[in-house]
């Protein structure tokens, strides 16, 4: 279904002087169309290196020109079944299945030209001489160069700022998916914690988390499992999941990111396994207080940079310095999205934004351990809705 207000998209694009957005990254295509070919990633090779997976969405500033989608020919059945809101559907290439080729035994079939199909759509819609916004960060030069060759009179600009501006404000359907994702994510986290046993490795618990995602109807995006302190120096980063064995007196940190219908729950907790030291207990209390204090500032009208400054001021008397360069961040189809609660992001919080809070400290005793509690919130008209409240913030659960 359509996950944004077209009038708002028009306003954003016209303010930036954009006539049409050409989205090519997986997350932007999926956002604008609510469609992505399930088995495919951005670089999936179909039958040779000239035929890699590519799906494109064109979003004209004027809705009467009609949005369009360009997909590989072998996706036609999938598109019909998934039936996204975009009805102008075009296909490139002969498709993956040889029974559809002119000569099924051709050893060198034409791979097709996705940019030619895209350019033809733009010409038909009277946009060939307009300002075309492409995802410069993600669209390779081979593709972008081909599109510019086919449309020599067009002006090409970057689409990234316009797409992010559109994605920051969530629609009712996105919010519904977030609520379900966070409900599932909270349960998956708690069930994973209750599955922890002495002698387990981080990889063992990671496998439990993956399994629980499937059992609870969520997709596994990623999760960090960290046991510690474990004698590690984390001055420039946290350890990847590995073979540290869980012992009594350790913390378990799970930073989980399951998703539901494309939308992510970003939830992190630190819990004690067995009785932890007094200093670890105190660090947990401080971290919990930091999150709860920052929650008081999450409301429409607050600048992201103001919330970050308030967080930084809290460190003056707690005995720990800040660890990460922001207080929290936006979430959507990607776990880290604008706006960031950072000193250089002056975005004003608005209703229907989804943000996290994750002030983080580093406890050093027997090795470094990042102490992090992360929660996800919906900005409402008068405050916040705590989407991950079902996951206890307690030291022991």
Annotated model-derived regions:
Residues 1-397:
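Active-site neighborhoods and metal-handling regions in enzymes and metal-associated proteins
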């Amino acid at each position: 279904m359509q996950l944004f207000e077209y009038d708002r998209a028009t306003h954003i694009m016209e303010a930036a002087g954009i006539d049409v957005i050409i989205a090519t990254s997986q997350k932007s295509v999926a956002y604008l169309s609510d469609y992505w070919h399930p088995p495919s990633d951005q670089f999936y090779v179909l039958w040779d290196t000239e035929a890699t997976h590519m799906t494109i969405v064109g979003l004209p500033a004027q809705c009467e020109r009609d949005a369009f989608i360009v997909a590989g020919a072998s996706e036609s059945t999938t598109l019909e079944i998934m039936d996204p809101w975009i009805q102008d559907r075009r296909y490139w290439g002969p498709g993956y299945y040889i029974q559809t080729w002119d000569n099924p035994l051709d050893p060198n079939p034409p791979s097709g030209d996705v940019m030619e199909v895209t350019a033809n759509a733009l010409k038909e819609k009277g946009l060939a001489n307009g300002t075309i916004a492409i995802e410069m960060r993600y669209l390779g030069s081979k593709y972008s160069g081909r599109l510019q060759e086919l449309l020599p009179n067009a002006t090409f600009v970057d689409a990234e700022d316009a797409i992010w501006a559109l994605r920051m404000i969530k629609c009712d359907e996105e919010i519904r998916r977030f609520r379900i994702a966070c409900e599932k994510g909270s349960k998956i986290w708690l069930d994973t914690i209750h599955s922890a046993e002495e002698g387990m490795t981080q990889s063992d618990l990671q496998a439990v988390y993956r399994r629980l995602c499937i059992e609870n109807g969520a997709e596994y995006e990623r999760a960090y499992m960290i046991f510690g302190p474990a004698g590690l120096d984390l001055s420039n980063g946290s350890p990847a999941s590995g073979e540290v064995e869980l012992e009594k007196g350790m913390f378990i940190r799970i930073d989980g990111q399951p998703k539901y219908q494309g939308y992510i729950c970003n939830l992190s907790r630190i819990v004690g396994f067995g009785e932890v030291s007094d200093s670890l207990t105190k660090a947990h209390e401080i971290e919990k207080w930091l999150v709860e204090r920052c929650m008081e500032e999450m409301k429409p009208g607050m600048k992201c940079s103001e919330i970050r400054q308030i967080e930084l001021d809290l460190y003056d008397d707690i005995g720990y310095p800040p660890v990460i360069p922001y207080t929290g961040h936006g979430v959507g189809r990607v776990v880290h999205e604008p706006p960031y609660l950072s000193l250089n992001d002056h975005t004003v919080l608005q209703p229907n934004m989804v943000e996290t809070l994750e002030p983080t400290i580093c406890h050093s005793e027997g090795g470094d351990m990042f102490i992090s509690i992360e929660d996800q919130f919906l900005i409402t008209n008068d405050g916040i809705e705590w989407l991950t409240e079902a996951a206890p913030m307690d030291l022991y659960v």
